[in-house]
A protein has these predicted regions:
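C-terminal segments of large proteins
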Residues: 1-142
Length: 142
């Protein structure tokens, strides 16, 4: 049993008159070019940990909208977010016990049937502490 638990969900974000609305994406959801996708990663940690790396892989049809790598602060947690071609990496010097939610937007750029990658997390100095999310397929039409 690992102290790390990951859950990854994709949401379709649509703008309405009352503001943005997000709806969960599943295997039956039909996406189209230009859609805005919100990635939500929920991380549960049952003990304090140091030097942890989380890698969120994405489908070839998705492009990140914020491409600048930077240090971020959120809910008392400091981490470095590094956006790359096929994945977004999160580096934690210190990861306190608790539950954390990370979100970032993606844009749909290609049609087809894709496997959206999994999210993995691992302690850099104690690799036996590792976990991963499940993958999901996405279908993109016109």
């Amino acid at each position: 049993e690992t102290p790390l638990k990951l859950q990854k969900k994709l949401f379709l974000q649509e703008n309405t008159k009352t503001g943005p609305v997000i709806t969960p994406i599943d295997n039956k959801t039909k996406l189209k070019l230009g859609d805005l996708i919100k990635v939500r990663i929920e991380l549960r940690v049952d003990r304090d940990m140091e030097f942890v790396h989380m890698k969120d892989m994405r489908a070839a049809s998705f492009e990140p909208t914020n491409v600048i790598s930077r240090y971020k602060w959120q809910d008392g947690l400091g981490y470095y977010e590094s956006t790359r071609d096929a994945a977004t990496n999160f580096f934690f010097d210190f990861l306190p016990k608790g539950t954390y939610v990370f979100e970032y937007p993606l844009r749909v750029t290609h049609k087809g049937n894709y496997s959206n990658g999994i999210t993995t997390i691992q302690s850099m100095y104690a690799p036996e502490f590792t976990s991963h999310s499940e993958g999901v397929r996405v279908k993109i039409g016109e």
